[in-house]
Amino acid sequence: MRYADPSANRDLLGSRTLLFIFICAFALVTLLQQILYGRNYIKRYFEFYEGPFEYNSTRCLELRHEILEVKVLSMVKQSELFDRWKSLQMCKWAMNISEANQFKSTLSRCCNAPAFLFTTQKNTPLGTKLKYEVDTSGIYHINQEIFRMFPKDMPYYRSQFKKCAVVGNGGILKNSRCGREINSADFVFRCNLPPISEKYTMDVGVKTDVVTVNPSIITERFHKLEKWRRPFYRVLQVYENASVLLPAFYNTRNTDVSIRVKYVLDDFESPQAVYYFHPQYLVNVSRYWLSLGVRAKRISTGLILVTAALELCEEVHLFGFWAFPMNPSGLYITHHYYDNVKPRPGFHAMPSEIFNFLHLHSRGILRVHTGTCSCC
């Protein structure tokens, strides 16, 4: 008869005990890291229900620092950035006047929207050989006919409007109920003929003071206005008396179709003004944001409008700007509030743009709205 060695059983039991202790210790350390590393989750859970914190409270200073300490987007996981941003929403937002003025002063030196946002008779005299933004070898000679289309001077001046809303087209706007807050702004910018029909007004509002039109939309949807003139005119009437803004001098392909927009509105005796981005303004804005890490073939129209708004408005609010497939709560959203058509890959650097907006929000320079609004 063979007998089991009792010491062997004790060794096996001891090994299992050590393994169990190791697993428990590892789990405990991991749990403590989750609780203590970077943020105190339990404390924040209860703080959330205490109501919004004042902008300059110690807690909010810490939360803003957690956004600002991320110098480049690749430093943190997307979920980590979302969590930090979501935590910051418990803080009231207020404009940091000194930070905002300093930033606007920088924009004034590099870009100067009040003087160069649009081509005007003042900044682009008759006979000017205007260089395109992209086709730098291309030159457009400003003749009498084109010169008459330009306003005599910029229609807007520095800090003219108290509160502006720049409305992007992101799916983050869907079910936001931000329409009333957008409509309450003194001046509203919109991008690329977005739908503002009754189906969407609760979320996106209707007020529009400037709406941009990408010439590719005119080419694809309205056959370059060679035949489809009235349908295009009807689309613009949705925005009532909003000014129409186009990048006529971005490249040579854009010019004729952009100028045709002016002819169409004149033919239908529309009161809507037509303006064209000054190509040098677009070049300067692109260079400025490149210096802040936005590397793209072309910056988005939204970023251009935000840059201009920061000079033309005292206070700037952003709606519909979000470049991720999930909202800050981790729920999947459509790319636009009206469809899920993705952009051409590699053309814009939208995540980098949004990342910069979150920094500007944290510095009190502008406000980014990504949640549900409770206006007025």
From Swiss-Prot:
Record topology, Cytoplasmic segments: 1-17
EC category: transferase
GO cellular component: Golgi membrane
Gene Ontology terms: biological process: carbohydrate metabolic process; glycosphingolipid biosynthetic process; N-glycan processing; oligosaccharide metabolic process; protein glycosylation
Pathway terms, separated by semicolons: Protein modification; protein glycosylation
CDD domains named among the record's database cross-references: GT29_ST8SIA5
E.C. designation(s): 2.4.99.-
Pfam families with a match to the protein in the record: Glyco_transf_29
Residues of this chain annotated as glycosylated in UniProt: N56, N96, N241, N284
Cysteine-cysteine disulfides: C164-C313, C178-C373
Keyword annotations: Disulfide bond, Glycoprotein, Glycosyltransferase, Golgi apparatus, Lipid metabolism, Membrane, Signal-anchor, Transferase, Transmembrane, Transmembrane helix
Cellular localisation: Golgi apparatus membrane
Positions contributing to substrate binding: N192, N214, P215, S216, S300, T301, G302
InterPro entries assigned: Glyco_trans_29, Glycosyltr_29_Sialyltrsf, GT29-like_sf, Sialyl_trans
Active-site residues, as the UniProt record annotates them: H348
MF annotations from Gene Ontology: alpha-N-acetylneuraminate alpha-2,8-sialyltransferase activity; sialyltransferase activity
Primary location class: Golgi
Record function comment: Involved in the synthesis of gangliosides GD1c, GT1a, GQ1b, GP1c and GT3 from GD1a, GT1b, GM1b and GD3 respectively.
Similarity annotation: Belongs to the glycosyltransferase 29 family.
Protein known as: Alpha-2,8-sialyltransferase 8E
Organism: Homo sapiens
Taxonomic path: Eukaryota, Metazoa, Chordata, Craniata, Vertebrata
